[in-house]
Design a protein with these regions (language model features):
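Basic nucleic-acid-binding interfaces
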Residues: 1-10, 16-92
Length: 92
């Protein structure tokens, strides 16, 4: 059995305050918390589907928004950070 290839994702969200903690804790199970409503990291398609299903069960689609950016190849990407820089924040 071939192992699943991981991809880099960035997840951002804008959800009602009463759901923020649950959404944050769910994202934290799969990805690194890099800003207030932003998570990033390497994840397989299977784990990403699990994350999406968990998030869908938590939000109200008419009120909340979650964006997932997928990067299959990091070759042409770079990251520039200004301000507070954490030690282990060098994924890109």
């Amino acid at each position: 059995m071939e192992s699943e290839k991981a991809m880099f994702v960035i997840v951002t969200y804008d959800v009602a305050s009463k759901r923020v903690t649950k959404v944050m804790k769910t994202c934290r199970k799969y990805l690194k918390h890099v800003q207030k409503s932003v998570f990033e990291g390497m994840i397989t398609e299977g784990k990403l589907n699990q994350l999406k299903n968990e998030l869908i069960s938590l939000i109200v689609c008419a009120e909340d928004k979650i964006c997932i950016y997928k990067v299959d190849n990091l070759k042409y990407t770079s990251k520039e950070q200004i301000g507070i820089i954490e030690k282990d924040n060098n994924i890109l």
